[in-house]
């Protein structure tokens, strides 16, 4: 099996070929997802909520992320692997480089940072030092205390224009990929069309180049509140996890998921 690369993702964008991605936190699920056809995985700091039981991602440490990144890499050696940089691990460019190096040594192909144009100096520094970067705009869970909860972002014109400008700035600084979370579908389309780098959506409609879900949401095993944008693919697959992942891939690639019911206006 060939290793998935960023060059492939850029080619898929040019070809308008949509792709499905998932979070993974251990070797077993990573291997299972890869065997069903998932080619891009994210070791998300969402593990703070899904695995550790916290009510936010803020308590997650770089050591936590490195541990799970190593596990996922062993399970899916050929996937393009992203790893979240947790809260306050990239407060300065120097700190970001130190922690990004740790995650890269653990097996990540790329690190993901949450934030707008204030991150440009950090992204530029990382890119110059051969650390590939994925940006993250819209609802950025590490900023939950500022947002006052997990709310849709970019609904007002001023906020939408700012998000678009931030996306452009991140790309110009050297970001190779962008995650766009919980924004109106019209804004997601503007961002996706404006950028030359691939855009992965979560709660951003079916107009982005790729889609990502937290694995627990895709399998319907999330406790408590279920996000509007999620779909329980396991429930549509007679309880067969492998069939559920294949269905998720098929619906993303076919533009079926996310449907209007999963989309914010």
Curated annotation (Swiss-Prot):
Query: InterPro entries, per this entry?
Result: Pantoate_hydroxy_MeTrfase, Pyrv/PenolPyrv_kinase-like_dom, Pyrv_kinase-like_dom_sf
What is catalysed by this protein? 3-methyl-2-oxobutanoate + (6R)-5,10-methylene-5,6,7,8-tetrahydrofolate + H2O = 2-dehydropantoate + (6S)-5,6,7,8-tetrahydrofolate
Q: Which UniProt keywords apply?
A: Cytoplasm, Magnesium, Metal-binding, Pantothenate biosynthesis, Transferase
Q: What class of enzyme is it?
A: transferase
List its EC numbers: 2.1.2.11
> Binding of 3-methyl-2-oxobutanoate: at which residues?
45-46, 84, 112
Which GO BP terms apply?
A: pantothenate biosynthetic process
Quote the record's binding site residues for Mg(2+). 45, 84, 114
Which domain of life does the protein's organism represent? Answer: Bacteria
According to its record, what are the GO cellular component terms? cytoplasm
Taken from the UniProt record, the cysteine pairs bridged by disulfide bonds within this chain are none
Cell compartment(s), UniProt? Cytoplasm
What family name appears in the similarity comment?
Belongs to the PanB family.
NCBIfam families per UniProt: panB, PRK00311.1
State the name under which the record lists this protein: 3-methyl-2-oxobutanoate hydroxymethyltransferase
**Taxonomic source organism:** Yersinia pestis
Classification from the root reads: Bacteria, Pseudomonadati, Pseudomonadota, Gammaproteobacteria, Enterobacterales
């Amino acid at each position: 099996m060939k290793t998935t690369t960023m060059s492939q993702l850029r080619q898929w964008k040019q070809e308008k070929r949509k792709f499905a991605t998932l979070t993974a936190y251990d070797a077993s699920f990573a291997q299972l997802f890869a065997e069903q056809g998932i080619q891009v995985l994210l070791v998300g700091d969402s593990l703070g909520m899904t695995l550790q039981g916290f009510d936010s991602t803020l308590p997650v440490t770089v050591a936590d992320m490195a541990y799970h990144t190593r596990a996922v890499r062993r399970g899916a050696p050929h996937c393009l692997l992203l790893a979240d940089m947790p809260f306050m691990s990239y407060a300065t460019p120097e700190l970001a480089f130190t922690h990004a190096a740790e995650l890269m040594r653990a097996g990540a192909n790329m690190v993901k940072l949450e934030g707008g144009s204030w991150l440009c100096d950090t992204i530029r520094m990382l890119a110059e030092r051969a650390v590939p970067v994925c940006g993250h705009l819209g609802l950025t869970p590490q900023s939950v205390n500022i947002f006052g909860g997990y709310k849709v972002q970019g609904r007002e014109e001023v906020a939408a224009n700012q998000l678009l400008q931030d996306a452009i700035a991140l790309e110009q600084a050297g970001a190779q990929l962008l995650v766009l979370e919980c924004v109106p579908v019209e804004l997601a389309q503007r961002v996706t069309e404006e950028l030359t780098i691939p855009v992965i959506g979560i709660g951003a409609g079916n107009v982005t180049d790729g889609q990502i879900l937290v694995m627990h949401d895709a399998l319907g095993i999330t406790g408590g509140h279920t996000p509007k944008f999620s779909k329980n693919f396991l429930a549509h697959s007679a309880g067969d996890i492998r069939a559920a992942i294949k269905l998720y891939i098929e619906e993303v690639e076919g533009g079926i998921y996310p449907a209007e019911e999963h989309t914010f206006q």
